[in-house]
């Protein structure tokens, strides 16, 4: 599923596009924060039928957003001991997938980086006593370039990427989100790029939509935690204790695709709005 966690400019016309969710204006913050499932490797760009609903959603979403001055992506596909930001002025492409047709390795997303903003955001993180560093060599991985190629194909917005923390401690990722709260007053789009269901053996690679009660149970739990009537303290504790959720380890044998939710929720400090709840590769996501 996809969540809008904070926004001040989305229009109600989103309903006319038949996307599920409710969008409300929030004059307090300029930042926009979204968590979404980014799909299976390069398959959305290759036109895979199992991603059709996602492709339609992702290509339509920017029309509902104010164009940001900067995009910060927390990608499930990057883990470091320290919170690490890309530091290159023009990050290269990092094709962190294998076994796909040759065209998957010709995908290009030539968006500029922003070294000055990387340094500034690293300083915000470090101020909260979280070790941080810049990586001037690493490129954009597919957690960034696949969704953004659908959303902003002109690649004309500076993009930064922030790593997860090795060890995958949920509390540490909520704290990482807390460290970014000063960004809420800026015209920045913060994206948590993961997958709310990520069991590679359970995906329907033949694009069949079969009922899966375990998948449904976890998705319903996660939607309630992120959008339901809970205090922020309760919400964060649920996310810390996510392994207690129904079918948690079935849906996430390893939690790297879930943890961008924790970062986004830590930044926003408020309930989210559900904006997509459909099937990707046969699973509710």
Model-derived features: where do they sit?
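Cysteine-centered motifs
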Residues: 8-9
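Basic polycationic patches enriched in arginine
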Residues: 13-20
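A short aromatic-anchored loop/beta-hairpin motif
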Residues: 24-124, 128-132
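Beta-strand elements within well-structured catalytic alpha/beta cores of enzymes
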Residues: 32-37, 70-76, 162, 183-196, ...
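Long, well-ordered alpha-helical scaffolding segments within enzyme catalytic domains
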Residues: 53-64, 171-186
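Flexible, glycine/proline-enriched loop segments at strand-loop-helix junctions
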Residues: 104-112, 163-170, 248
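Internal, conserved structured core segments that host functional sites
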Residues: 118-174, 179
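Surface-exposed, charge/polar-rich loops and edge strands
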Residues: 123, 127, 158, 168, ...
């Amino acid at each position: 599923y996809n969540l809008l966690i904070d926004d001040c400019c989305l229009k109600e016309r989103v309903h006319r596009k038949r996307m599920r969710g409710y969008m409300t204006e929030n004059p307090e913050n300029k930042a926009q924060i979204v968590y979404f499932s980014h799909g299976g490797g390069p398959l959305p760009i290759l036109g895979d039928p199992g991603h059709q609903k996602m492709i339609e959603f992702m290509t339509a979403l920017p029309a509902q957003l104010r164009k940001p001055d900067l995009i910060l992506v927390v990608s499930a596909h990057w883990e470091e001991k320290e919170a690490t930001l890309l530091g290159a002025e023009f990050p290269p492409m990092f094709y962190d997938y294998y076994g796909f047709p040759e065209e998957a390795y010709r995908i290009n997303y030539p968006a500029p980086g922003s070294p000055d903003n990387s340094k500034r955001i690293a300083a915000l993180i470090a101020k909260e006593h979280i070790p941080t560093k810049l990586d001037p060599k690493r490129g954009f991985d597919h957690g960034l370039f696949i969704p953004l190629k659908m959303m902003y194909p002109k690649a004309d917005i500076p993009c930064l990427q922030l790593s997860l923390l090795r060890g995958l401690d949920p509390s540490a990722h909520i704290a990482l989100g807390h460290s970014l709260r000063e960004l809420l007053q800026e015209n920045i789009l913060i994206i948590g790029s993961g997958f709310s269901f990520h069991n590679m053996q359970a995906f329907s690679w033949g694009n069949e939509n079969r009922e899966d009660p375990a998948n449904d149970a976890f998705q319903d739990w996660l939607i309630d935690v992120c959008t339901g009537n809970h205090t922020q303290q309760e919400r964060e504790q649920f996310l810390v204790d996510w392994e207690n959720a129904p079918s948690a380890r079935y849906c996430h044998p390893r939690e790297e695709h879930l943890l961008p939710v924790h970062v986004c929720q830590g930044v926003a400090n408020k309930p989210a709005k559900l904006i997509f709840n459909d099937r990707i590769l046969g699973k509710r996501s």
